[in-house]
Curated annotation (Swiss-Prot):
GO terms for biological process: ATP synthesis coupled electron transport. This is NADH-quinone oxidoreductase subunit N. It catalyses: a quinone + NADH + 5 H(+)(in) = a quinol + NAD(+) + 4 H(+)(out). It comes from Neorickettsia risticii (strain Illinois). The chain crosses the membrane at residues 3-23, 29-49, 64-84, 92-112, 147-167, 188-208, 222-242, 265-285, 291-311, 320-340, 358-378, 394-414, 437-457.
């Protein structure tokens, strides 16, 4: 099969993005472009793993399925954008599509160079989306902060890659593990630190509150969900190269085992720090977007703990499974936030006056995000804890469970504001179209969060 056929989704998305530059770019056109790319991805499915472009990309059934999931979530995002009728710029859809292109390329990348370029492609789009609300000082401030910090961490990543290349003489992902020296270890640390920044994992998380609060809510919805899923898959791809390494001229030696454990330890430590910082940083937050940002740090921590203790490159990996559940839940929660004109947590009491169904669904989503049984968020956390116990990380398993209990208190506080505080007299200002589309998304996400555990049984 022609190698360019395997790149059909990326080629299709790039061409459609360029076409939108010359059209009156609207969110409806963006949704159509994603649907066409989704069809192209179905058409380019493969039953075997294939390396293309001289080994820069690896196309496999799993990577193609991940692309389908990312594209499906992007469709939901564009429906949200259509519902609120806010794009702020005629190039809004183009920026989203180009950022999406970077995500699709990143999950297929098999060299450090291609991975770096793909990650930067989807990051640049996010920098602009953060400040796309031109008349907002907060949005401009968020965009500048995000761009400056992101550029700095980009330099850290490329410096780490250069150190790895100096020692190993190779840019494939397996080059992370075929050498063993202090310079090589520093290179790995710098490279992984850049990826940790992209997913807002501790200790590279301080930016997230200001960016989530300052960016337009539509933009926040985009980079709060999709980049995390794609980058978690990237991290799992790095780990999967350790088990066992099939590399020409190399054997699975003591040095390789030391490097693999070193990478796992970085992710594991970051996971613990993320849960700790995320759990306690979310306390006392009064802005709902800021709260979601800090709470997401803890969720990333659970993902990293799952990734660091499993090399399974599949949806059965605890880190990827957690990321999927997190994405579903957050899409529903942020759909509710899109309905709110005032992003203060106390404004959530308006939900019950305006739409009792949305208020109920929102509370169910909060329970799922908190990890309350029997919601699917509980099972994703339990899966991570089970993996920790099986790998003899008992203290960390206990710590993660205690952190989950603590986080349930502030989720309960928001549920109280939504359902048990005196109702406001005014309703949420939204057209019928807003309510119809966003309510549908919220209810569907809530149903999945409530009854999704049935899928685990079967």
């Amino acid at each position: 099969m022609n190698q360019y056929l395997f790149l059909l989704p990326e080629i299709t998305l790039f061409i459609l993005s360029c076409l939108l530059l010359f059209l009156k770019s609207r969110n409806e056109f963006g949704l159509i472009a994603v649907l066409i790319t989704l069809a192209a991805t179905f058409f380019s499915q493969t039953c075997t793993s294939v390396e293309i472009l001289n080994g820069m990309l690896l196309i496999s059934p799993f990577t193609q399925n991940v692309k389908l999931v990312i594209l499906a979530f992007t469709c939901v995002f564009f429906i949200q954008a259509i519902a609120v009728k806010q794009s702020y710029s005629k190039n809004f859809s183009v920026l989203v599509l180009l950022s999406l292109l970077g995500m699709l390329l990143s999950v297929s990348s098999s060299t450090l160079a291609s991975l770096y370029l793909a990650v930067e492609l989807h990051s640049i789009g996010q920098y602009i989306l953060a400040c796309i609300k031109h008349k907002s000082i907060k949005s401009a401030e968020a965009g500048v902060k995000y761009t400056l910090l992101g550029t700095f961490m980009s330099a850290v990543m490329i410096y780490g890659i250069s150190l790895i290349f100096v020692v190993s003489g190779d840019l494939s992902l397996k080059s992370l593990f075929i050498a063993n020296s202090k310079i090589h270890s520093i290179g790995i640390l710098l490279f992984i630190s850049g990826l940790m920044f992209k997913v807002a994992a501790a200790p590279f998380h301080a930016w997230i509150g200001d960016i989530y609060e300052g960016a337009p809510t539509v933009s926040t919805t985009f980079f709060a969900v999709l980049p995390k899923l794609s980058l978690i898959v990237v991290l799992v791809s790095l780990i999967s190269n350790l088990e066992p390494i099939a590399y020409t001229g190399s054997t699975y030696s003591t040095e390789l085992m030391e490097n693999s454990q070193y990478l796992r330890n970085i992710l594991f430590t970051s996971g613990i720090l993320s849960i700790a910082f995320g759990t306690f940083s979310a306390f006392g937050q009064k802005n709902i977007k800021r709260f979601i940002g800090f709470a997401s740090i803890a969720h990333v921590g659970y993902m990293l703990l799952g990734v660091s203790n499993s090399a399974s490159l599949s949806f059965g990996n605890p880190g990827i499974a957690y990321a999927l559940v997190y994405s579903f839940t957050n899409l529903g929660i942020l759909s509710v936030v899109l309905m709110l004109k005032d992003k203060h947590i106390t404004s959530l009491k308006k939900l019950r006056c305006s739409n009792n169904l949305v208020a109920l669904a929102f509370v169910l989503l909060l329970f799922s995000s908190a990890g309350v049984p029997p919601f699917i968020g509980f099972w994703s956390k339990a899966y991570v804890v089970k993996t920790l116990v099986e790998t003899n990380h008992i203290p960390t398993a206990i710590f993660s469970m205690l952190a989950g209990v603590i986080s349930a208190f502030y989720y309960a506080r928001i549920a109280k504001e939504t359902y048990f505080t005196n109702m406001a007299e005014e309703n949420i200002e939204a057209s019928l179209r807003h309510n119809t589309l966003l309510t549908s998304i919220v209810v569907l996400c809530a149903l999945f969060s409530t009854f999704g555990f049935v899928l685990l049984i079967y």
